[in-house]
A protein has these predicted regions:
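Short linear sequence motif anchored by a di-proline
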Residues: 17, 28, 32, 40-48, ...
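Acidic-enriched, low-complexity/disordered segments with a strong bias for Aspartate over Glutamate
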Residues: 28, 45, 76-77, 104, ...
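DNA polymerase processivity clamps
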Residues: 45-53, 121-129
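Intrinsic disorder/low-complexity detector
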Residues: 2-24, 52-105, 131-156
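Short flexible/disordered coil segments
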Residues: 83-89, 116-124
């Protein structure tokens, strides 16, 4: 039996997103992935995911399964030089990229790595439905501002 979740549709200045809720960044860099996103994107524990930076307006990152990057999106050449160390940043075209494993429905990113994405312990990240391959965690921008006017669950 599938669980039912309640996403909120948020619209601001012509931009709209479905929000799962807020993910609070733990002191150790842990970020819980909302259960609905885990189900919708078939995210499994121990899978490798890539943190791909978002644009400057909203900040944050997309959480994409590494297998999708290499197969579906054809990023083999760009990812070839990624560090073998989990959570270590490599810049690609001036933007930070890193990989981590999903554990217990969330990710733990080293605090110094999160700083590369302008994210810090205690921050609330707005978790929204991204494109067809990845949930997105936003830091700022009009959608985040509008989301503050709604009652959304906080995952921590």
């Amino acid at each position: 039996m599938k669980r039912r979740f309640r996403m909120v549709y948020i619209e601001k200045k012509g931009k709209a997103e479905y929000a799962y809720g807020w993910s609070k960044v733990g002191e150790d860099g842990r970020i819980v992935i909302p259960p609905e996103a885990v189900e919708e994107y078939s995210i499994k524990d121990h899978g490798k995911v890539m943190l791909m930076p978002r644009h400057k307006l909203s900040g944050g990152f997309e959480l994409i399964l590494v297998g999708l990057l290499t197969g579906l999106l054809g990023m083999d050449d760009r990812l070839a030089g990624l560090p073998t160390t989990e959570g270590k940043v490599r810049e690609i075209e001036g933007k930070p990229f890193c990989w981590v494993r999903i554990r217990d429905g969330g990710i733990t990113v080293p605090v110094e790595t999160l700083a590369e994405y302008l994210i810090h312990p205690g921050d609330l990240l707005l978790s929204v439905r991204g494109n067809y391959v990845a949930p997105v965690f936003l830091v700022k921008g009009p959608i985040v501002k509008e989301a503050k006017a709604h009652e959304l669950p906080v995952y921590e």
